[in-house]
A protein has these predicted regions:
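One-carbon transfer enzymes
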Residues: 1-232, 246, 297, 306-309, ...
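An anion-binding loop in the catalytic cleft
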Residues: 217-323
Length: 323
């Protein structure tokens, strides 16, 4: 079976390495152009070994078209005579003309329990919405984005402290395992999978920088989840408002909800620091309290929130607001 793999970033790497380890006939890698890869690393993707580096180490041809659906991209794919596309976080949507090139079509390794969280950022939106579990779906590729028949799934719980980066790395391993299982089944004969229930479909749109902006009207659990979801990019941020002084932009890197503690202060208000608590406490929605543990002020290094407070001298009425 001649396989063309398409992927960009750390989520794709275990699937690629698994195919190579199991002696599958990978005839080419399609990955984003180097410029686009750099942009992705600055945004939603973590830096890994690099799909291109893996391919070059194994003497596998690398193609990096800006538009895979162009006449040039289509011609290259046809010349490769693939039996199967294996796609994992590639970063480009394949046209119907491209999808019919391989004799067996294409499979996609998607980091959610489809039909929930169709789109470019399933891991981040899963965490932001306080889901308790997630997983990886292997689907048959169709012109509908993430809408093909489900060939396999694996389910896993989400740890209360997992960031999007942590979870994506873990899901990438699970995805590689079940993708290989699906390919082995396809080698033995046709498989059809189960259609998705469209009524359950939800979206996971690509993240933008402004998605990191913290809404203090949410409760502490929701804000904590939002902060984890925005790691490693775009990172959750807020403005510290002080009387008669310019606001300070702060990235909040780590925080947890204060269990059972409540406050009547308006959301965003910084509570009076306690010498016994090595954190910054902030009022959130529904009378809840968020324990802020680690921050990074604009232009400064990462630091414990308590250290930040000591250096800034808290005053009654200081608050955090949307930027």
């Amino acid at each position: 079976m001649r396989i063309v793999i398409m992927g960009t970033g750390i989520f794709s790497e275990p699937t690629f390495e698994s195919l190579l380890l199991n002696k599958k006939d990978v005839v080419a890698l399609f990955t984003q152009p180097d410029r686009a890869i750099g942009e992705e690393k600055a945004s939603t993707r973590q830096v890994g070994k690099g799909m291109k580096n893996i391919a070059l180490q194994h003497h596998i041809p690398v193609f990096q078209p800006f538009k895979i659906n162009s006449d040039e991209g289509l011609a290259i794919l046809r010349d490769l005579r693939p039996d199967l596309f294996v796609v994992a976080a590639y970063g480009q949507i394949l046209s119907p003309e491209v999808l019919v090139v391989p004799t067996l079509g294409g499979i996609n390794v998607h980091a959610s329990l489809l039909p929930k969280y169709r789109g470019a950022a399933p891991v981040q939106w899963t965490i932001a919405n306080c889901e308790k579990e997630t997983g990886v779906s292997i689907i048959q590729m169709t012109p509908t984005l993430d809408g093909g028949n489900i060939l396999a799934t694996v389910v896993t719980p989400i740890s209360p402290e997992e960031t999007a980066g942590d979870l994506e790395a873990r899901l990438s391993i699970l995805g590689a395992t079940i993708a290989l299982e699906v390919i082995k089944k396809m080698e033995a004969g046709p498989i059809h999978g189960l259609p998705q229930d469209i009524s359950l479909a939800t979206k996971a749109p690509k993240l933008r920088k402004e998605h990191g902006n913290i809404n203090w009207e949410l409760n502490a659990l929701q804000i904590s989840a939002h902060i984890r979801a925005m790691q490693p990019w775009p990172t959750a941020f807020t403005l510290w408002q002080r009387a008669e002084q310019p606001p300070v932009r702060i990235m909040i890197l780590k925080a947890t909800p204060a269990l059972e503690a409540t406050t009547s202060l308006p959301p965003g208000t910084i509570l009076e620091p306690s010498k016994d608590l090595n954190m910054m406490q902030v009022a959130a929605g529904n009378r809840t309290i968020l324990n802020v543990l680690e921050v990074q002020p604009a232009g400064k290094r990462k630091m414990a929130a308590a250290e930040f407070l000591r250096g800034r001298h808290w005053f009654s009425g200081d608050s955090l607001t949307r930027a």
